[in-house]
């Protein structure tokens, strides 16, 4: 009884903190530079959230007698913990606000869904099914969830890169079209005046473009690092799962829906890494592949559970009925 109470308290404390954090981040976003202390407070709040989630996992492990990764609810808690772990690392390195924004938002939405009440029955700890009563549980599922977390963060950074690149190209195209229209519809003197004004603002646009280019490079750098790390975790998770499957079911691979989509996920990010090995890699091309991978991960991790079929059906769930 006491363990359930502690778990309930830790769950709602972590959710309350991340809800406050997202509000603080919105305030910081709209007020821009004036709220440095507010940003630092949100970072400290994420550390408290990490500690609460750690305590939640330890508590659930203690009273259930097994590592808390036996169903979707527990894996979502662990996914939130993984996001918060990734989040606090750049906090100590400083000057990585865009990365911590991605990871912080991921914690908010994951933890929000976990504690929303949409998941029924599986939020209660139960005895492991025979197939899960193995030492491979910790190795396989931990590596897979850490891989998902790293890949999702890297993919979100790639999506942010695409948005910034698209807006940059759109502004350049608009400016070129504006000058072209002026050359047709205005007299030569007015056109030269516009050109003169444009040259006067060159330093402003150059500085702005420089910082935008630096941001794109940083997003590309951290995206590739996150995806590379996640790909390693995913590979280890798939290989350990194959060994576990051979022990449990007598076959290394059964083309189960979960296994199939995990393999598709691995292929997508293998393609991403391949695009990074070319002599002159283009950020946008690899970012497009990573964006596709973002959708594939959610299909693999979450969408397949909606089916409730296959050898991994014990991870399925039901939504709260009206």
From Swiss-Prot:
Question: Any idea which UniProt keywords this protein has?
Answer: Chloroplast, Cytochrome c-type biogenesis, Membrane, Plastid, Thylakoid, Transmembrane, Transmembrane helix
Q: Pfam families, per this entry?
A: Cytochrom_C_asm (PF01578)
Q: What is its main location?
A: plastid
Q: Name one GO biological process term.
A: cytochrome complex assembly
Compartments reported by the entry: Plastid, Chloroplast thylakoid membrane
Its membrane topology: Multi-pass membrane protein
Q: Does the keyword Cytoplasm apply?
A: no
| Entries under InterPro entries matching the protein | Cyt_c_assembly (IPR002541), Cyt_c_biogenesis_CcsA (IPR017562), Cyt_c_biogenesis_CcsA/CcmC (IPR045062)
Is the Transmembrane keyword given for this protein? Answer: yes
Task: Give me the Gene Ontology terms describing cellular component.
Answer: chloroplast thylakoid membrane; plasma membrane
Here the disulfide bonds are none
Gene Ontology MF annotations:
heme binding
* Membrane spanning residue stretches: 15-35, 45-65, 72-92, 98-120, 144-164, 226-246, 253-273, 287-307
Q: Which PANTHER family does this chain map to?
A: CYTOCHROME B_B6 PROTEIN-RELATED, HEME EXPORTER PROTEIN C
In the record, the note on similarity to other proteins reads: Belongs to the CcmF/CycK/Ccl1/NrfE/CcsA family.
Q: What does this protein do?
A: Required during biogenesis of c-type cytochromes (cytochrome c6 and cytochrome f) at the step of heme attachment.
* Record-linked NCBIfam families: cytochr_II_ccsB
Q: How does it assemble?
A: May interact with Ccs1.
Q: What's the protein name?
A: Cytochrome c biogenesis protein CcsA
Q: Identify the species of origin.
A: Coffea arabica (Arabian coffee)
Q: What is the lineage of its organism?
A: Eukaryota, Viridiplantae, Streptophyta, Embryophyta, Tracheophyta
